[in-house]
């Protein structure tokens, strides 16, 4: 079972329409920072010395790798994120003769960028020790090989944490809802490290590593669009009123058009601005189908209410959908069924094709 931590502050984040303690990583990060502080005090002094050199030569890297193995075998006070992954780290660095992944490469900056932009993966950047890692990245110029070995292990531990969250989810399913009968999964951490060693960039690794379900990629793309909309201020509300049918004239039409321009890309009116024209009807039908409503093009109360759902709530729904897909088996087989309970909709997938 994957570890989940608690915090005395009991902060919460909203996942879909549920609320869950947002401290799943906070205590781990705090412990990470405690071990980091001791290392950082040592490294800060050493970086200030004129003899410090940036690690580059194969000989230096080989010496650091020896120190990595020694730490994993003999060090009893390893920081918690490293200690929890000691076996996998040992298996990679010793049994597979693993090369150093972080020192002498550009990967630390790539990992930092990924963690700081975790929102694009539907994850919370505050759940990851970016600031601590940034300090360690700056410490790569020290000539203390044992301290550099700890830097290597810190980055590997942080990478494995994020790789796990993207692959199998950051929360246990039953922590979200006790009625979810899905067992939490774990990743092969050694395999993740070996895969990372075989590619030239973290982006390439994560593109291949994230869930392969096409719906996941579609949700990630939609999330990027909605986050961009949020940065621009989101969308306004549409007033309720009488049902609006195709061809009718109504002062709410411009507001509806503006709303659907943001989410569905509908263009400007080719007739009078207040006329509910064919182009807008098509956009409304697409919107209704996506929301599980009857896609008849009639804008009634249910359609207006759906349009007025706050953007942040839509974003949280996408994030929750991405998390659920991470819980699912990687291979669903050639045939499976998707049920949309809210929309009273069932779809059979056969060989990648949707059968209504």
Per-region residue spans from a language model:
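N-terminal secretory signal peptides that target proteins for export/translocation
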Residues: 1-28
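Extended rod-forming repeat segments used as scaffolds/tethers
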Residues: 18-21, 34, 47
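Bacterial N-terminal signal peptides
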Residues: 33-44
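Auxiliary tRNA-acceptor-end handling modules of aminoacyl-tRNA synthetases
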Residues: 53-356
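Local alpha-helix boundary/kink/capping signal
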Residues: 28, 39-40, 135
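N-terminal twin-arginine translocation
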Residues: 25-26, 43-46
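Sec/Tat signal peptide C-region and signal peptidase I cleavage site
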Residues: 46-52
């Amino acid at each position: 079972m994957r570890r989940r931590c608690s915090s005395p502050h009991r902060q919460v984040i909203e996942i879909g329409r549920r609320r869950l303690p947002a401290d799943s990583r906070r205590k781990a990060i705090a412990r990470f920072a405690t071990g980091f502080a001791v290392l950082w005090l040592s490294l800060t002094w050493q970086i200030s010395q004129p003899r410090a050199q940036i690690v580059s030569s194969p000989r230096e890297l080989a010496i650091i790798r020896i120190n990595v193995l020694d730490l994993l075998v003999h060090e009893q006070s390893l920081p918690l994120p490293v200690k929890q992954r000691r076996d996998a780290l040992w298996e990679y660095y010793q049994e597979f003769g693993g090369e150093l992944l972080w020192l002498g490469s550009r990967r630390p900056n790539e990992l930092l960028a990924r963690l700081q932009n975790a929102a694009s993966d539907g994850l919370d950047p505050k759940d990851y020790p970016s600031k601590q890692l940034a300090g360690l990245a700056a410490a790569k110029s020290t000539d203390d090989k044992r301290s550099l070995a700890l830097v290597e292990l810190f980055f590997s531990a942080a990478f494995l944490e994020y790789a796990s969250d993207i692959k199998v989810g950051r929360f246990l399913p039953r922590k979200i809802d006790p009625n979810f009968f899905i067992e939490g999964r774990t990743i092969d951490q050694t395999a993740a490290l070996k895969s990372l060693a075989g590619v030239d960039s973290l982006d390439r690794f994560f593109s291949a590593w994230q869930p392969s379900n096409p719906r996941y990629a579609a949700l990630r793309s939609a999330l990027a669009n909605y986050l961009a909309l949020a940065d621009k201020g989101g969308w306004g509300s549409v007033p309720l009123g009488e049902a609006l049918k195709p061809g009718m004239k109504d002062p709410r039409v411009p507001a509806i058009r503006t709303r659907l321009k943001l989410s569905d890309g509908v263009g400007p009116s080719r007739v009078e601005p207040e006329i509910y024209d064919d182009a807008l009807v098509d956009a409304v039908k697409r919107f209704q189908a996506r929301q599980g409503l009857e896609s008849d093009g009639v804008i009634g109360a249910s359609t207006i209410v759906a349009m007025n759902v706050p953007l942040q709530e839509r974003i949280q729904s996408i994030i929750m959908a991405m998390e659920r897909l991470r819980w699912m088996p990687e291979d669903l087989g050639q045939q499976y069924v998707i049920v949309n309970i809210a929309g009273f909709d069932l779809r059979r997938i056969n060989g990648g094709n949707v059968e209504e």
